[in-house]
């Protein structure tokens, strides 16, 4: 299946290659290879801070929208939210902006549609939770069978916020895929899933389970559709129970304790720090629970057994 990248995704890939391999002198070549203009790449690079600020502003407004959405049990659309904002919070926000943010972050109201012919399509659009199939049986001694995922926030550069999405192998502790973003829109989990697919070379364990919390990313119908397409079974923690995904929480805890990410002055610097830590963690972090091996070594050990 051929993957078509948008110009923005191509620019992001070029920037990643240049940063990862320190190849500053081949911008023109990479742009030509990707079929994009050199001037377009530099314009995209220059606008990065503007995009980050716009995403941060969106997130502030979205958190307010989300609080109302949850308060009303996910049964309100853009117009009711606009009226609640004005009357209860004294905040004036255009209904088109509210609708845009709801669409951007995947909020879909559970409201009854007057048209009976749309009932079936509506049902497919509602967020759905999944049972806790895993039941804390994280280590099943089979690489790729238990896949744990979650998102955490990272504050850097005087209060700017980024979000780190990861997938961890429950048997080997290896971080199989990760994606860092300045926004919480659905793209963060789509990108993570795509990187997981690439890391696994699209060859998943026949009984693979993807375990997460009940966050709106993981209950979103489009995300669930993508997981199902990979023939992976979804499992979710019980509401408000962080112990149901303890190994993933543990990794984030170690990262925050060991990395001076708050000292980063830019998103690019933070991204480099995250990439470097995960590379070191997977390949050079010896763990007592893995028979004193690294996650990558332990994966090889289990596969050879």
What are these regions (language model features)?
Residues 1-34:
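Helical coiled-coil/dimerization "stalks"
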Residues 3-8, 31, 40-142, 296-302:
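Basic, flexible linker segments flanking DNA-binding modules
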Residues 30-31, 41, 65, 81, ...:
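Mobile genetic element proteins and their domesticated derivatives, centered on retroelements
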Residues 90, 138-140, 214, 241-243, ...:
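Conserved, non-catalytic sequence blocks in retroelement Pol enzymes and Pol-derived host proteins
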Residues 111-115, 209-214, 228-246, 263-265:
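RNase H-like polynucleotidyl transferase catalytic core
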Residues 136-176, 182-184:
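An active-site-proximal beta-strand-loop segment
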Residues 160, 179-203:
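Active-site beta-loop-alpha junctions of metal-dependent nucleic acid enzymes
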Residues 221, 228-232, 256-305:
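C-terminal domain-tail junction helix/linker
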